[in-house]
Each structure stands twice: as C-alpha cells, then as structure tokens.
C-alpha cells in the first residue's frame, strides 16, 4: 500500500500538536492544579453546551442604577434562595428585607482590553444584612473560585447526575459569600487581549480593587459590612497583595474607606524561597523518602533557592516541576503517589460531579448571565504569571498584621503546602510581633459538636492566628467541613478556640 508524503506530514503535524497541547495542559497550575479529577458526564445527561445562552450581563453599565443591576443580576437557582420575582417587591435597598438572594454577572476591570471579571454573590442565609462579606479566591494561578462554591464552602453540592443539593455545612449559612473568578482569564472571567492578562500580583490586586469598588456601587448595602478576604493555595499570593493594596488605598484620603477586617489563607504559597526548603524533611519524616532520596530532594531545593536568588524565575519553575509538579517528577517516582494534596492518598480523588461541564450547559450559562462565554481552565493565565510564581509576598505581612487580623491554616496531611512550609515562612516574617507570637503556647482545639476528637492545634497572639487542622489535606473545607467552618466562624467573630 502506498502512503503519500503529504499524508505522513499530516500525521506528523497532528502528533506534534498533541504533544504540545499535552505539555501545555501539564503546566496549567503548579500549586493548585485545575486537573482535579471528576466523574465523566453520565450518558443520560443531555449536554447542551453549544446552544445559545443569550446575552452576557455587564454590570459596569449599571453603576448609577443599582436597583436595575440587582434585578438583572439576580439568579433563580432555587432553595434556599428567594425567587427573583420577590426582589421586584423591594424598592431598592436589600436591607429592607430579611429574604436573601444570589447574584451573578461581569464587572469590567479594564475597558481598554475589555477585561471582565465574573462573580457569584450569595447573601447570607441567616437573613442578617449586617453579616460580614467574605470574599473567596481560589489558587492556581488559574483556579476558579466557583470550584469552592460547588466543592468546598458554598451552599450547593453538585451530584454526578447534574443535580444540585444543599450542602449541610456551608460558610454561606452565616456569611455573605462573594466568589470571584480571578485573575482575568480564569473560569468565566475573560479579556479580549493578551495585554489584559495579569503579569504580577500588583496587577491582580489593582484589578481586584477596581472590581470591589464597582461591586459596592452595585450592592451599596454591603459597603459598611465587615470585609474578609479568604482563599487557599496559590491565593496565598493573591490575598496578601489584595489586602495590602486595600490598606494602602484606605490611607489615601481621596479614596472611600473599605471596611477590611481580616484575611484567611489556607495552605497558602506565600514565600516560595523559604517554603520550598521543607519538602525533603517533610518527605523523610513522613516515611515517604529514605535518607538517600532525602539528599536528592535537598539538592533540588538548593537549586530552586539558588535560581530564585538569581532571579532565574523560569529555571526555578522548571526545577519545581521536576521535583514535585510533574508527572513525571521525583516525588511521584519515589513514592508512587500522584496526590500531593494529601499524603494519605495515592491518586487524586474523583469528585461526585463535573462542575465545569455543569456550568457550561447553555441553560446554566443563561441562568447565571454569562451568555455565550464558557468556563475554562485558561493556560494563558499561567503563562503570563509564570515569571511571578517564585516571587514572595512575605514582605507585605508586617503592614497587613499591623492593620487587620490574619489567620494562616493548614491541613495536617497536605504535602504541597503543608504545615511545616507555613511554619517556616512565619518564622522569617520581619514583624515586631513575631517573637511574642512564636512564644505563645499551642493549644489543643476541639469543636462543640465533637468534644472527643481533637480538631487541630492553634497558636494565637493579638491579630495573628495559626491553625493546623487534623485529618485534612490541601483543601481543608472539603476534608473537614465542620472544623473549617468552626475555625472561620471563630476567627471572624473574635471567639476563642475551645481547648480540650
């Protein structure tokens, strides 16, 4: 059989294209990989992602008409939230009712590049309009906060038949929750230009601040409420940068004061140059590596630190990938484990529903006002931030700690950003309160609903709290929802952690 040269060239091009695409997918998210596994779409689900989903809602067009903005952005998602028809009965102020609603839409953060940030805002289910406003930011870079809404902290859990059920334990039961797909290009957030993507934490913080200023104009009832910024993993970079930017802007008398009270970072990458030095010891003392393998990991760590010190950012990223963020990588080769989110598990777990496929249904996209925009894991987000990943935000903590409350928490069994990585970073913060904090006793923490089992360990001094949550991995609210809620509730409400 004769095979033409053009046919062979075509096959070769296809193979090369596939390899390139696969290599790009592997690089999407080094610290919060968006390749978390989900069940495939069941055969009996009619997947209608290609159908028209109507017009997207750009709320920046309604900054002078917040009544219309609320009516247009309201989502009829069902219990426990009120029907949007009931919103029409309210004159304009959400504080006029104890009913609670949920809202979605886009806010334009850069008109030049048509950069638009998607959000999902859920009023507190307790009906108290004075409830703190809690922003949740996912990691990545490129992890959508919608993940937490459906998998960790939000009021809904997605089953594998595309059915939403109410989550038994949700942060939304006591707090107004604002999930932001950040940075631009993540999830439903998008930009029309490569110039619209963020290249560093300053640009991300500026976009988030622009977003928040407009959010308060659209939902002015929440402007005076206490604000907390929370998140996990690579959001350990976003949250300090964003909160520091707010503090700086608050000190400018020309800007309206934002009532920021605290930040909460779970298993956060904040200072790569110190945190990366802990992998060899962590692997050895948990029995995952022997002495010889520990030495190899020490060599990797030293090379990463050297690359960071020399500002060779791409080299540092590549070395990190070789050490732990493949596959293939050294960690997986010596342990046989691919789940660095939880050392108790060999492979990443499969979650009960594919929230990406669920959100991309045309009926859902129409309901949440995104139109024909699609939820995506955008590799461009990572590419633009690649040079910023090894850089630190630790230098921002002294100013933050002098102005607001801070809680840093870790899951006991997380490997990628485990407790020892956070502890090492904390000990190098140049803050006047760091020594009394380190000298404060660690207490054993138990929650009222389970006064037998130890929930975790807490160290606290003035505005600074550190928590290790027992029996949890990288995603604490998923692994230990009751403990995570008790922790965040006590932190926000200034309640002491009960000891055993």
UniProtKB/Swiss-Prot annotation:
Carbohydrate-modified residues: 110, 161, 333, 360
InterPro entries to which the protein is assigned, alphabetical: AB_hydrolase_fold, Peptidase_S10, Ser_caboxypep_his_AS, Ser_caboxypep_ser_AS
EC number(s) recorded for this UniProt protein: 3.4.16.-
Active site residues per record: 233, 414, 474
GO biological process, one term: proteolysis
Cellular location(s): Secreted
Residues of the signal peptide: 1-23
One GO CC annotation: extracellular region
The protein's enzyme class: hydrolase
Pfam families: Peptidase_S10
UniProt KW keywords: Carboxypeptidase, Glycoprotein, Hydrolase, Protease, Secreted, Signal, Zymogen
Single Gene Ontology MF annotation: serine-type carboxypeptidase activity
Entry's family note: Belongs to the peptidase S10 family.
Protein role: May be involved in the digestion of phagocytosed particles in the lysosome, participation in an inflammatory protease cascade, and trimming of peptides for antigen presentation.
Protein name: Probable serine carboxypeptidase CPVL
Gene this protein is translated from: cpvl
